[in-house]
Amino acid sequence: MAHPAGPELAGRRATRLPYLLLVTRTGLSVAQGAALTLGAVLGTGVISLPALAAAEAGPASLVAWLALIALSVPLATTFASLGARHPDGGGVSTYARLAFGEHVSTMVGWAFYLTIGVGAPVAAGFAGSYVADAVGGGRATNLTATAGIIALVTLLNWFGIRISGRVQLGIAGAIALLLAVSVAVSLPHADLGNLTPFAPHGWSAVGRAASLLVWAFAGWEILTSLSAEYHDPARDIRRSTTIALVVVGVLYLGIAFATVAVLGSDTGPAPLSDLLVLGFGGGARPVTTVVAVLLTLGAVNAYFAGGSRLGAALARDGGMPHVLAAGGGPGEVPRRSLAVIAGIALGTVGTMAASGLSTDATLLLATGTFSFVYVVGAAAALRLLPRGTASWWCAVASLVAALVLLGLTGTHVVGPILFAGAGLAWTVVKRRTSPLPAPVEPARAGSCP
């Protein structure tokens, strides 16, 4: 049976959302939407961030987890409302253009595009630490696995091969089950003595831990791309978002508490593996590694696929060099844009190898960019959403929280600012030499709260 909206629209949507393969004939259901959102948010951050946050703030890192979970409520609501009113694959760049014009749109687009390459080694490095832990390797093994994951994802995208929605959801489901099992089997080993002193590095460390954890909660913006596929966006997005929020909050807080209360000062770089070993023995470690690698492949693949199309779209609209626009049409592969992202990512890994930096060295730069994107998205929402409504007030709360998070990144915010400044400078020079093409306008959905 043909897609109810016609084959052309179905083709365009399939191109915009290659991972969305669970759309029913009548639209995306609440359960499917919740599962896809959960898969986007439960990314690679769950692999190692509990240990990084605990190292930064000790048991007080639990306060940072609670704060980020609370922040997710207005943040997810804001992006869901934007997506329902302005369904388009451009995401925050589209909202920035509608609210503030081409310059801001290009700036946020450049910051996000370039950060995908710089941040990819962080995501791949999380899985690399699990590989090194499983085989008894060290730094060289970690870096090799990190580069291998980036190369494999690049190869998959180069030939247009995409991970299907069902496989990606299966991976997310496996991770959710693994987290729940990890907490359940490790809690009998909890020692409340590990919760004292509660704030060994002072309360200011909670803020630093929170800035790290932004990575774990990146992904709510994917709602803006999924919104056009819901059967009834105004009704169903709220329901699916609520389900995803509850599941994410319970799983993240559970694994964070187990990391602190069970492992204490013995927390290693792969706490999920350590928790399972406590419950099932050494045989559980390889299973965790396989799931971690699969999850990382899915997450990095999604960012590379989306990032390469973002670069091509920006180039098409005059926001990046036109040479990157090749392959950006429906059914095509934006190989030039993909090659730029892959080159940045592998170059970053090479720099880490030569300088002795760890694979999470660019983590705060990446989280700074996510915070920057959220600031722009929330600010755009204040202009695009009906003033005084619940979603508008959520945008207010999101903007305040995102500004705080952006400030907590400290000097690391310089990275996205420089990226954005480069985009602005390029656009100004380009406008002086040749006129910019007219951007493609997104479709306008019906009114929503």
State where each predicted segment sits:
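Membrane-interface "cap" regions at the ends of multi-pass membrane proteins
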Residues: 3, 8-51, 56-60, 73, ...
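Helix-loop-helix junctions that connect adjacent transmembrane segments
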Residues: 12, 16-25, 61-62, 66, ...
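Transmembrane helix-loop junctions in multi-pass membrane proteins
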Residues: 46-50, 156-161, 265, 320, ...
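Hydrophobic transmembrane alpha-helices that form the core helical bundles
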Residues: 52, 56, 64, 73-150, ...
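TM-loop-TM module centered on a large, flexible mid-protein loop between adjacent transmembrane helices
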Residues: 94-96, 101, 133-134, 242-303, ...
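Membrane-interface loop-to-helix entry segments
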Residues: 141-189, 200-201, 241-245, 369-376, ...
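Alpha-helical transmembrane segments
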Residues: 320-328, 356-357, 375-390
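A generic transmembrane alpha-helix motif of multi-pass inner-membrane proteins
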Residues: 366, 379-449
